[in-house]
Structures are given as structure tokens and as C-alpha cells.
């Protein structure tokens, strides 16, 4: 991908030097008092703490364990890490340009998300964020969170190397920001706990893949040979069936929340071909039609690319089956 020397987004928060910790506070103190003086000692401590709090001599957070605290330390980044940092800021800038234009076609503004780069652990408006979660978007603070170490995992464990594979991940998370702006995410979140929630979660994720494809469509002038293949490999590698097959040795379609490899490749490619937000409605079509046939691009994809035939007892298309056929009218259009 041709990215060096191009505009970098200013909506980037470098949190790599932040150390996040939760104060142990009362938990440790109550444990010590309980061991030494028993329940009576604990009761006395609580009463004393309450009195001191009422007269303003202590912060109440000291008695409940305290809030999450952060401490900043100097950032020491390798040249490779700093290059990745610069790269994702350019990718974010590209998404800003694309979505400002695309939503503008429909007369809507584009409030830009913030990208936070962190290491290991961070605090978000959606709760604690950890590197093990991979990149994610928090609708409560409208931020995308990325630990740059994930890209090593993407290359090593998911066999999806390349800078455009990394860009696809950012574009997918920004797709969730678009869904938040349009109200789609909120409607799906309201169904949490319902019998068909997983189905709508898959639809939501596939639409974010579609939006990543829309971004790629409008950035083709910056692509190198093989970039699209990198994104397709990444979409293939992080399908629910691919991940379950790799980690569990079997596939459980009813537990899918993000879509199969074939579905994710298909909807990214659909967005790439269209380039229009209004063609990405994954909610009004029957669930089984989310599959379709992904066009072969003569790629040297891993054998997991079309995994349906890899599992005994699963017929063609069965990985796309989900019980329930509830109508859910959510438009992917900004109009």
C-alpha cells in the first residue's frame, strides 16, 4: 500500500506509555483486618471508614477499591513499531476522507472517531480493554482501540501478513463507527440476550466488512499489487469457522457471532465492488442468502478458505444456517 508521505490523522491518541492499574484499597485492608481481628474488626473498620468519609477526611473510593488508575511513562518504540504507528494514522485519515464524502452524499456529517494505540491493557468507556481482545471499537466513547502487537499475531497465528491486511482491520472497526452513527449497532445491542442475537451479530459484523470494502474501493489508487489479496486472506483467517476449526478442532455454527470465512470474504468483496454505503444492507435479506458464492480470485489462500467441505457432517451452505427468520429492518443507507 502506498502510504508514506501522505496525510496522517490527528484523531490519534497515543496511550502506549500509559500503565493501567486498579487500586486494591479496601480489599487488601479488609483481608488483613479480618485475619487479625475477625468479623468484629471488619465491622469496626467499616464504621470508622464511614465516619471519616462523612467528615470529608477520606475519599470513598479508598473503601471500595478505587477507580482504575493510569500512570504515564516514556514511550520506547522500535523503528518497526513506530512505522506501524505512522501507518495506521494514515489509514485512519483515509477512512475519514472516504466516510466524510460517502455520508456527505446523503447530506449527513461525519463525526470522526478517535484511534487509541495502547499496549497490553487500557481503560475504555466500555470497560477494560486488553490486547488479547484484538482491535475493537467502543461505541460509548466512539474510539477504535488497537494494540500494535496484534499485527504480529495476525501474521504469525492467522497467516495474514501485509500492510493492507492491517489496514482492513482498522477499516472494519471504523465500519462499526458508521453503524453507531446510523443507529444500527444500537438496534442490534437491544436484542442482546434474545434467541436470535447471534444471527444479528453476524449481520452486523458482515456489514462492517462491507464498509471496509467500501473504504478499499475508494482507495484503489493507493494499492499495490497483491493488496486486495492480503485483505481477503485476513477476512478468511478471522472467520468464525476458521478460528473454531483452528482452536477447537470443530465448528459450531449456532455459536457464530462474526460470520464464516466465506461470508466475510464475500461481503468485503461486495463493498469493494460497489463502493456505495446503501448497497451494504445485511439485515433485510434472508440469513441463508448472506452466504452466496464468493468469486474465486485465483489466490493462494490457505485450505481454510472454503471450509464447508473440511468438516464431516456439514453439507454445502450449512455453515450459514441459523435458526429463526425474524424480520429486522435496519437500513445500511445513510438516507
PLM feature spans:
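Long amphipathic alpha-helical segments used for membrane anchoring, targeting, substrate engagement
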Residues: 1-76
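Short helix/loop segments within enzyme catalytic domains
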Residues: 79-110, 115, 196-199, 203-244
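Catalytic zinc-binding patch centered on the HExxH motif and its immediate surroundings
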Residues: 121-147
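Active-site recognition of the HExxH zinc-binding catalytic motif
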Residues: 99, 168-181, 209, 213, ...
Amino acid at each position: 500500500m502506498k502510504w508514506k508521505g501522505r496525510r496522517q490523522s490527528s484523531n490519534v491518541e497515543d496511550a502506549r506509555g500509559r500503565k493501567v492499574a486498579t487500586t486494591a484499597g479496601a480489599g487488601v485492608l479488609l483481608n488483613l483486618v479480618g485475619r487479625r481481628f475477625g468479623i468484629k474488626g471488619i465491622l469496626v473498620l467499616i464504621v470508622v471508614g464511614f465516619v471519616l468519609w462523612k467528615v470529608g477526611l477520606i475519599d470513598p473510593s479508598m473503601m471500595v477499591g478505587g477507580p482504575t488508575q493510569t500512570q504515564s511513562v516514556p514511550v520506547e518504540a522500535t523503528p518497526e513499531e513506530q512505522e506501524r504507528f505512522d501507518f495506521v494514522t494514515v489509514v485512519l485519515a483515509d477512512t475519514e476522507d472516504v466516510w466524510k464524502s460517502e455520508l456527505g452524499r446523503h447530506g449527513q456529517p461525519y463525526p470522526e472517531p478517535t484511534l487509541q494505540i495502547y499496549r497490553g491493557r487500557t481503560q475504555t468507556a466500555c470497560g477494560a480493554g486488553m490486547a488479547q481482545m484484538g482491535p475493537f471499537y467502543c461505541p460509548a466513547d466512539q474510539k477504535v482501540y488497537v494494540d500494535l502487537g496484534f499485527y504480529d499475531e495476525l501474521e504469525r497465528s492467522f497467516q495474514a501478513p501485509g500492510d493492507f491486511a492491517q489496514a482492513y482491520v482498522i477499516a472494519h472497526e471504523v465500519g462499526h463507527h458508521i453503524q453507531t452513527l446510523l443507529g444500527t449497532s444500537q438496534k442490534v445491542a437491544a436484542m442482546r440476550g434474545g434467541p436470535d442475537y447471534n444471527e444479528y451479530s453476524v449481520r452486523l459484523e458482515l456489514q462492517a466488512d462491507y464498509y471496509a470494502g467500501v473504504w478499499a474501493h475508494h482507495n484503489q489508487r493507493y494499492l499495490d499489487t497483491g493488496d486486495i489479496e492480503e485483505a481477503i486472506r485476513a477476512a478468511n483467517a478471522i472467520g468464525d469457522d476458521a478460528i473454531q476449526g483452528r482452536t477447537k478442532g470443530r465448528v459450531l455454527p449456532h455459536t457464530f457471532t462474526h460470520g464464516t470465512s466465506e461470508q466475510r470474504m464475500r461481503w468485503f468483496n461486495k463493498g469493494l465492488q460497489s463502493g456505495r454505503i446503501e448497497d451494504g444492507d445485511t439485515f433485510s435479506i434472508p440469513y441463508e442468502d448472506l452466504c452466496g458464492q464468493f468469486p474465486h480470485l485465483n489466490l493462494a489462500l490457505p485450505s481454510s478458505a472454503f471450509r464447508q467441505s473440511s468438516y464431516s457432517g456439514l453439507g454445502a451452505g450449512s455453515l450459514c444456517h441459523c435458526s429463526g427468520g425474524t424480520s429486522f429492518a435496519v437500513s445500511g443507507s445513510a438516507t
